[in-house]
């Protein structure tokens, strides 16, 4: 019994030593940071925490995306966060007016890095049918940088989920930029 245990200990030591050698080779070759970045990107991309900022009728569709029929939890976004400090994706759903633009910017500034913004619906994207009024901001992109536009008036929950998947893909691949959905 003790001899069998001794042989297993020797086997475990050899496995540990070989794993350490692999890690050392990767560190010397500079490959380990890339592997770690990919793992972290995968984990972070599959666990985005949205901050729902529903201002108008698009908020109803945003709430529908959280229901059991569409199940936003499948994409790692379990629930909308009520604090910007706990969120990394802001979903602006609705018309942003001049007074509300200050609030949107303040919430965006309070989010931790990296942070992403989804403009949901025609009103958030370009002012919608109210674009020509005196107090409506002609698109939330004039207040905060927008990463993904979700078109529609109001957009379907599936479109919001597609926009969220675009954000996740940006996180996983390390690409960040302006993505417009048509």
Swiss-Prot record:
UniProt KW keywords: 4Fe-4S, Cell membrane, Iron, Iron-sulfur, Membrane, Metal-binding, NAD, Quinone, Translocase, Transport
Domain of life from the UniProt record: Bacteria
GO cellular component entries:
plasma membrane; respiratory chain complex I
- How is the cofactor bound, in the record's words? Binds 1 [4Fe-4S] cluster.
| Principal subcellular localisation of the protein | membrane
Identify the stretch annotated as signal peptide in this record.
Answer: none
Output the PANTHER family linked to this UniProt entry.
NADH DEHYDROGENASE, NADH DEHYDROGENASE [UBIQUINONE] IRON-SULFUR PROTEIN 7, MITOCHONDRIAL
The record's section on HAMAP family has:
NDH1_NuoB (MF_01356)
This protein's name:
NADH-quinone oxidoreductase subunit B 2
Q: Which organism is it from?
A: Symbiobacterium thermophilum (strain DSM 24528 / JCM 14929 / IAM 14863 / T)
Q: Which gene encodes it?
A: nuoB2
């Amino acid at each position: 019994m003790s001899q069998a245990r001794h042989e297993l200990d020797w086997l475990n030591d050899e496995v540990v030593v070989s794993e350490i050698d692999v890690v050392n080779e990767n560190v010397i070759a500079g490959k380990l940071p890339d592997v770690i970045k990919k793992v972290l990107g995968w984990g972070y991309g599959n666990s985005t925490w949205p901050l729902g900022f529903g201002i108008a009728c698009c908020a109803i569709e945003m709430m529908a995306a959280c229901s059991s029929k569409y199940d936003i939890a499948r994409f790692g976004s379990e629930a909308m966060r009520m604090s910007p400090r706990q969120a990394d994706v802001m979903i602006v759903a609705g018309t942003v007016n001049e007074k509300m633009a200050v609030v949107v910017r303040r919430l965006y500034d309070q989010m931790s890095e990296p942070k992403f913004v989804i403009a949901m619906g025609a009103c958030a994207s370009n002012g919608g049918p109210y674009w020509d009024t005196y107090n409506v901001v002609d698109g939330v992109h004039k207040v905060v940088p927008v990463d993904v536009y979700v078109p529609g008036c109001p957009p379907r929950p599936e479109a919001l989920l597609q926009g969220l998947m675009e954000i996740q893909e940006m996180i996983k691949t390390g690409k960040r930029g302006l993505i417009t959905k048509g």
